[in-house]
Curated annotation (Swiss-Prot):
<dbReference type="GO" id="GO:0042840">
    <property type="term" value="P:D-glucuronate catabolic process"/>
</dbReference>
<keyword id="KW-0456">Lyase</keyword>
<dbReference type="GO" id="GO:0008927">
    <property type="term" value="F:mannonate dehydratase activity"/>
</dbReference>
<protein>
    <recommendedName>
        <fullName>Mannonate dehydratase</fullName>
        <ecNumber>4.2.1.8</ecNumber>
    </recommendedName>
</protein>
<dbReference type="GO" id="GO:0030145">
    <property type="term" value="F:manganese ion binding"/>
</dbReference>
<keyword id="KW-0464">Manganese</keyword>
<dbReference type="Pfam" id="PF03786">
    <property type="entry name" value="UxuA"/>
</dbReference>
<comment type="similarity">
    <text>Belongs to the mannonate dehydratase family.</text>
</comment>
<keyword id="KW-0408">Iron</keyword>
<comment type="function">
    <text>Catalyzes the dehydration of D-mannonate.</text>
</comment>
<dbReference type="InterPro" id="IPR036237">
    <property type="entry name" value="Xyl_isomerase-like_sf"/>
</dbReference>
<dbReference type="InterPro" id="IPR004628">
    <property type="entry name" value="Man_deHydtase"/>
</dbReference>
<dbReference type="GO" id="GO:0008198">
    <property type="term" value="F:ferrous iron binding"/>
</dbReference>
<comment type="pathway">
    <text>Carbohydrate metabolism; pentose and glucuronate interconversion.</text>
</comment>
Amino acid sequence: MQLSFRWYGDSDPVTLKQIKQIPDMKHIVSAIYDVPVGDVWTKDKINALKSSIEQEGLTLSVMESLPVHESIKLGEANRDNLIENYKKSLRNLGESGIKTVCYNFMPVFDWTRSNLDYELEDGSKTLMYDNDFVKDIDPVTTNLNLPGWDESYTKEEMATLIEKYRQFDEEDLWKNLEYFLNAVLPIAIEHDIDLTIHPDDPPWSIFGIPRIIKTKESYQRLIAINSSKNNGICFCTGSLGCLEENDLPEIIKEFGDHIHFVHMRNIKRLDNHSFVESGHLSKYGSVDMKAVVRALKDINYKGTIRPDHGRMIWGETGKAGYGLFDRALGATYINGLIEGVETNDTTIS
């Protein structure tokens, strides 16, 4: 198990020099952020990013995310051209030495929260999802923008997309995911790229739009499309942990051959599908983080783990969920869990 850290490139207020001072931190998760969704990621851009990271003594190990264009998810007439571009990007990544690529198949909204500055009892600020608040919002008719909404869309473009997806059910979305995977997985397999799908965040339908990657049954259906290990999973404890029915260690054990990337964060489940993102320690949330790491050890997981969202602590400001301080604390906690399970120390929790 190897620690990694999300870095948003030169515009990120968290620097590579700071990241490499985190104990045992050697790997970076990043992406090409200045290319429009659907265009090709060139080798020049990929290798320039790699070089900037390697100059600081770190390794670019995961690309998160290589985004899937909405027209592919919708199955529109131009999807084949967009899929060809996706395949070219995958080839360029593989030929540049990138072997793990994360993506998602969430319609319109990659993730949604109702509050980025929810104050916990200790005074730290965190991300929060209030389901009672969100369920009464219609993005088509309201002027409100919630955290996680793609601001590259105009109000009119977003409304059009949402109305298209409201004509969909889960079967329609599954059909389009299968079409996409049947097209791109041969390229991933050829270049030994583990293509890892991130679960929906949160893992249920919002705004009348279907979501499909949310439970054990979702992964069973995913693997049924193609059983290759390259048809992979990004295992996110925070997203999957929002549903109490998801037994995270059991999911890890069932799908271990397909898990190639792990996001570790804790959440505190509240009533009626609401939740707050807590500190990483097990006792602060609803996810048994030690049980997750032990399950990863049991499947002999050798891939990367990144401390996912952190709280804003000690007066830090910046991109919500992606400050330095609490994610660094999360990394050291994960280090301790790994050391504990590898030495069978039952006192670690």
